[in-house]
Amino acid sequence: MRKNMIMIGAGMMLALASCDKTEIREITEDRVVPQPVDTIKVADHFYLDGHLSRTAEDLGGRPLDAANLFNDGEELYVANFAGKCVDVFDAETLEFKRSMSNGDRTLARDVYAEGDHLFVAAGENQEVQIFDRKTGKYLSRLGTGSWPASMISKVGCVCATPRLVFVRDSKYTNIRVFDREALNLGAANNNKVFAKLSTGGDFIGSSNEPLGESYDMEVIGDSLYAFIPRTGTIYSWKVEDIIQQKDYAPLKVSRSQEFKLRSISKTGDKDKFFVSMLKDGKIQLAEYSLADFQARNFANPLRCFTADDRVLLPSQTIIAYQKEKLILTNGAKLDRWDIRNNPAYEIKPR
């Protein structure tokens, strides 16, 4: 019996051994156990990169002198003074799309799109030309195109709202305001002025505002702003005050020798804006909140870019923002820079 039990026990052990495939090994590799951490601080480092230019070559060899521009988010309108036209580019790719002009009269110094219409300040031709924004057809003009009858002289700057058109030129020391509801786009001329907004002793063509330079006006928030870059002067009026009080709309004037703004661009955020300005003798492209801009608080921009050994910035540039890209006028070319970020992270274990 005992012999049989021993044989049965040995058989069971052999059967169990044949079923157990587990191998036992000594593991010597290092084991890393992830340790939870917290991000304490993210320090953004924004910079300009990815430069792109457009020149006369992109226009088929036609002259390019980018005096001013306007971006509606889909199309970029460029006042091409040398080309005597407005050139239209795709705002995202900067591919050339089409041109519009009224013969040789479109000596474009500025351009502004609002609603169905495009307004073009036609320089020494003493008129603001009005085009159909979609078809490019010339419709009419503000002024008469001849001195002294025209209420518009050598034009350097134009801006518009759904109700009004604002014009700065060399005729008077004021901004001429035209009522869009009173315009007759089937007429040759529209010469009736709705209001005149005083700009002190400043006018385009004066020693502080040479005719050959570029200027900007824009409606930001509820107000119209006009910039005199050489003196650091900013004029502003509330648009509703202009409609209600016309010539007597209250004026706000600020002057700064430290911050001299030349142009401003809206962004995709109604509470943020980019400006081109002169600070400490250097051109800066800076982003500000609406509140800081309205308060003329330019000391602490949200983001700021200056020229360096990689980035060259034009001295009198007009700026347009397009989805984290900055488009700049630069004489015989358009420049575009991408805004990029290389953030740094400060972390610690939990």
Model-inferred region functions:
Residues 89-94, 132-136, 179-183, 238-243, ...:
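Short loop/turn segments that connect beta-strands within beta-propeller blades
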Residues 63-68, 106-112, 150-158, 208-219, ...:
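Repeated scaffold domains used in trafficking and secretory/extracellular systems
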